[in-house]
Structures are given as C-alpha cells and as structure tokens.
C-alpha cells in the first residue's frame, strides 16, 4: 500500500451518504478541478461501495475509506477488512 504524505493546506470532502454511484464520481471531479485550480490537496472520502469506482474515474485526489475494522481475515460478518480498502 502506498503511503500518503499530505502537506497543508488541504481540504477534506466527506459526502457521507448524500451521494453514491455516478453522483459520487461527479463530486470527485468537482473536487479534483478545485484542487487543480487552487493548488490545494483534496482528501475525498466517498462511501466504501463507491471507492473503487471513484478511484478508476477520478485522478489527483487522496481517496480514503470512511471506515474499516482492524481485524484479520476470518470471521467478522459485516466487517470491512483493511485489505478490502487498499
């Protein structure tokens, strides 16, 4: 996993559960454009189910999962493994 080194100033966009799917991608594109225009780094935290989609469609943002569980693979129904959000 690539380590992130974010230098200030930065801005975080956390859409919570207001956007999903293509709307989450659109918001990511707006954040990317703002980052390029201002030179300010943007951390974007879409819903976990949109993380891979946004990663493929939008470049230039620091993407972070909203949540993960610090557990090893195995039992843990409903848990989010660290390996799943790489």
Where are these regions (language model features)?
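Conserved N-terminal beta1-alpha1 strand-loop-helix module at the mouth
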Residues: 2-77
